[in-house]
């Protein structure tokens, strides 16, 4: 009877301590939020524990205290609904508190024992899921007594409100004991591991300064706003403080709530009865632990905030305007110009073309059949410089002195420098579509100036006449009259060398001996479109064939073209390399441009064209063993 009288007298203390606990825990939550720029898993769990304490003292304990004060009147008694609400909320919050403490110890152990895995496993998301699971399990189990899982012989809400587990039912009491006991044991084990690991790390830092640390990784957008980050290793002092805080919370909870609840529950189940001191013990332990948590947070420098910081945090929370939402969104603060300032990669026919980062490109040129990914602004200037300047630098235009300035090579677009000899490109696109892009009349004129001598017997249909009369961008004719066949020089004719020949392609197939200068615009096989009308142009027997003249290595200096009979020295290596093409030289044609054929030239050429009859049609196909050919 004396214990029952103590319940109303203790109600005032519960209300006073409960109000103080509400303010202290609210301050603790604001302090933790003010000291941290972003929510971390451990801080989130600590704030969840503080919120659980606030709910515990605000709802069930305050309700019980008010009812005990009202019971001093003889006409007031507990009703069934109010008792069920009290029992459900009290045990829900008790289990949630127990599980929250265990999850805090587990996350701390995970953080100090496996730091890299903890930071790479999205621990914050797991903490949120843990809290959701804690509240779901706690509410389901604690709501069962209110819906019928209780002792039906004498219900706990019949005479007053007896909320001890033995008064509710054996099944509920056993489940409650197992959950609380397992949670307390797991929390103690995790805390011991975390404390041991932290102390071992402290000793390791003192013994070896090269201890592994996790770096801090921050991901920001183009405007410098943080989008995501991975926290690095904590300082030794901070790590020790946080581990000590977690260990203190676990120990205090086990001493003030875990073990007392286990003892009271086990004693009531064993005696199958409840005593007034059991209710006093459980309620006072709940209020005390709710008061101690803010004090523990205050002792840690990491979570201690002054009044100014807390006030600024409150103002920021109350403002919560659209600007803060844009800062946390993924696309709110990204400028549309950023879309154009990223690296672009395009591929065409197996060739990989990497574009600059800040340049804008004309991508509509891809519709023409070639990957012409040139910069948009200097497109025409670079094109004309290459056709008019690079040719003079590399080929030696008439009227222009040959020079080897690197400007000629630097102005060549990548598609012209690296894709001369792609067989797939030649096979996929018709030949006339390449000529306006891959050659020019001035290139032909320069090549003819080097190859053909200045003789009176040269016809108007020759290559030099074509270069003199034709416009710069005249497309090649596709009939048999447009086939080029250059007559080789005599044996005593001196070879012609071209120092200013274009460089070799990176993927050019190797050839025997020194490489000859090239026509970089002629493919392996010419288009045989109009041969039905003039097949005799290909079957005309030329003059007796002689070995082609060869060009020395490209590294040797160039020589001025000489008339027939000028120089008689000949490279033995080149003579041996050209021996195997002798049988094919007898079938070379001598027609170019005009019907009737072309007289034999008096001087050799630096380009070599091999002709072989086709087994199916009998026509002759010209092949080029030149430096820049498409073979």
Curated annotation (Swiss-Prot):
Q: What species does this protein belong to? A: Mus musculus
Q: What does this protein do?
A: Orphan receptor.
TM segment ranges: 12-32, 42-62, 85-105, 127-147, 163-183, 244-264, 277-297
Residues in the Cytoplasmic compartment per record: 33-41, 106-126, 184-243, 298-631
Q: What is this protein called?
A: Probable G-protein coupled receptor 153
Mark out the compositionally biased spans (Low complexity). 605-617
Where is it chiefly localized? membrane
Q: Which InterPro entries match?
A: GCR_153/162, GPCR_Rhodpsn, GPCR_Rhodpsn_7TM, GPR153
Mention any one GO cellular component term assigned to this protein in its UniProt record. Answer: plasma membrane
Q: Where is this region: Disordered?
A: 486-518, 546-590, 603-631
């Amino acid at each position: 009877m004396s214990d029952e009288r103590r319940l109303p007298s203790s109600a005032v203390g519960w209300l006073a301590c409960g109000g103080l606990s509400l303010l202290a825990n609210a301050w603790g939550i604001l302090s933790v939020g003010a000291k941290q720029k972003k929510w971390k898993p451990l801080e989130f769990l600590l704030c969840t524990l503080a919120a659980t304490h606030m709910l515990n003292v605000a709802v069930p304990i305050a309700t019980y205290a008010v009812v005990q004060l009202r019971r001093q009147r003889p006409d007031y008694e507990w009703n069934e609904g109010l008792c069920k609400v009290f029992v459900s909320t009290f045990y829900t919050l008790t289990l949630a508190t127990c599980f929250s403490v265990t999850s805090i110890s587990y996350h701390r152990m995970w953080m100090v024992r496996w730091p890299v895995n903890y930071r790479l496993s999205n621990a914050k998301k797991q903490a949120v899921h843990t809290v959701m699971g804690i509240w779901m399990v706690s509410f389901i189990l604690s709501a069962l007594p209110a819906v019928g899982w209780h002792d039906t012989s004498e219900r706990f809400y019949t005479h007053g409100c007896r909320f001890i587990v033995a008064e509710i039912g054996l099944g509920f009491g056993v489940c409650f004991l197992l959950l609380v006991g397992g949670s307390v044991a797991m929390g103690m084990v995790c805390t011991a591991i975390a404390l041991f690991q932290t102390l071992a790390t402290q000793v390791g830092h003192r013994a070896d300064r090269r201890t592994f640390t996790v770096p801090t990784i921050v991901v920001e957008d183009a405007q410098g706003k943080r989008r995501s980050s991975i926290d690095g290793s904590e300082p030794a002092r901070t790590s020790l403080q946080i581990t000590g805080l977690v260990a203190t919370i676990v120990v205090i909870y086990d001493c003030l709530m875990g073990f007392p609840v286990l003892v009271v529950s086990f004693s009531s189940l064993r005696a199958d009865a409840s005593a007034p001191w059991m209710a006093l013990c459980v309620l006072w332990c709940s209020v005390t632990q709710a008061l101690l948590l803010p004090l523990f947070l205050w002792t840690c420098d990491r979570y201690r905030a002054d009044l100014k910081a807390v006030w600024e945090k409150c103002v920021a929370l109350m403002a919560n305007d659209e600007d803060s939402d844009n800062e946390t969104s993924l696309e709110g603060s990204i400028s549309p110009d950023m879309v154009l300032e990223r690296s672009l990669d395009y591929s065409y026919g197996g060739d990989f073309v990497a574009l600059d980062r800040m340049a804008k490109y004309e991508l509509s040129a891809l519709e023409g059949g070639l990957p012409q990914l040139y910069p948009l602004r200097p497109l025409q200037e670079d094109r004309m410089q290459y056709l008019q300047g690079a040719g003079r630098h590399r080929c030696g235009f008439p009227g222009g002195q040959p020079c080897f300035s690197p400007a000629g090579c630097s102005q060549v677009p990548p598609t012209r420098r690296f894709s001369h000899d792609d067989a797939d490109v030649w096979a996929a696109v018709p030949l006339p579509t390449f000529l306006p892009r891959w050659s020019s009349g001035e290139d032909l004129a320069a090549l003819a100036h080097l190859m053909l001598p200045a003789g009176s017997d040269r016809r108007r249909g020759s290559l030099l006449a074509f270069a003199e009369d034709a416009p710069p961008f005249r497309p090649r004719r596709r009939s048999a009259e447009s086939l080029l066949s250059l007559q080789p020089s005599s044996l005593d004719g001196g070879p012609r060398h071209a120092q200013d020949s274009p460089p070799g392609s990176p993927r050019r197939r190797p050839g025997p001996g020194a490489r000859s200068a090239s026509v970089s615009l002629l493919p392996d096989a010419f288009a045989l479109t109009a041969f039905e009308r003039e097949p005799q142009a290909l079957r005309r027997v030329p003059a007796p064939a002689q070995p082609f003249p060869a060009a020395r290595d490209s590294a040797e200096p160039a020589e001025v073209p000489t008339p027939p009979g000028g120089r008689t020295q000949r490279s033995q290596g080149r003579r041996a390399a050209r021996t195997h093409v002798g049988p094919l030289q007898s079938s070379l044609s001598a027609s170019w441009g005009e019907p009737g054929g072309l007289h034999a030239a008096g001087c050799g050429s630096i380009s070599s064209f091999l002709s072989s009859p086709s087994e199916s049609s009998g026509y002759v196909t010209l092949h080029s063993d030149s430096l820049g050919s498409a073979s």
